[in-house]
Amino acid sequence: YASIYGNTENAAYYLANELSKLGVKDIAMYDVSSTDVSYLISETFRCSHIVLMSATYNLEIYPKMDDYISDMKRLNVSSKTFAIVDNGTWAPTAGKKMREAVETLKSCKICENTTTVKSAVNGSNAAALADLAKEIAAEIQG
């Protein structure tokens, strides 16, 4: 996740908790602002499902998340399932841009439930995050 004020981080913890309640094990979370991209890439190759969560920053993907996604493209990450969650109060655009970037990766799937958190987790987006957790859990548990 890429969080500016902590709200995207809170959404990441909320989603991880929902996944755990659904029986998903071995959940790993990383703050792209404080984790070297080499560790993120290593985990990307290890995992089958990756959730990209980013705040919108100047109508773009938060720079550290953008760096991570760029590295995935350069290293030809393939055959993964991605879930996308963006956060923004006025004009959340990070989700659309992350989707466009992931669509360039070979044999990768994007979950149908792309979610936007407007500032902070609340009733409506909490339900959307719970729906996303159900979709991810169903994919993982087959």
Model-derived regions, located:
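FMN-binding flavodoxin-like domain, especially the glycine-rich phosphate-binding loop
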Residues: Y13-S33, L40-G142
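Cytosolic transmitter module of two-component histidine kinases
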Residues: A2-I4
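Glycine-rich phosphate/diphosphate-binding loop of Rossmann-like nucleotide-binding domains
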Residues: G6-E9
